[in-house]
Amino acid sequence: MTAPELTAVDLYVDPSCPYAFQTARWVLEAAKVRSISATCNVMSLAELNGNNPDLPAEWAEWLVKAWRPVRVLTAARLAHGQEVVWPLYLAMATAIHIDKVEDYDVVIANALAEVGLPADLAAAADSTEYDDEVRASHHRGMDPVGMDVGTPVIHV
């Protein structure tokens, strides 16, 4: 008997989004009982909404903060491979949405330590060095569905 062919599921998420976190957890649970292979990819709420002149000031300020985890996720992927994205994403999102940690310096440092990645990756949070790659990943997720949807995006 041959194993069933796996269906590829590409999930595009921003750690700051609670809806993405719930969807990611659901996808991982579904992967336990269905023939799917789920890949976690970065999208950015800041990239999606940052050029909207109608945003309230507090939302615009929050979007600046939202760049930080996606930059670190991207830096980690580029330095250590795609396989670190799921655990790092889950560590960040759990800290933000379950543990209610609001200080993203703490979220990032603790998540990197939890998954055994170098602490110096945290420097990517405040660097624009990875922004082009964040945008590229964001657009790989968003372009097929249009920019009038938010996070998460799932491609099957």
Model feature map: region roles:
Residues 5, 13:
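Short metal-coordination and nucleic-acid-contact micro-motifs, chiefly zinc-binding Cys/His arrays
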Residues 15, 21-108:
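Structural alpha/beta surface segment adjacent to cysteine/selenocysteine redox centers
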Residues 18-19, 132:
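Short alpha-helical
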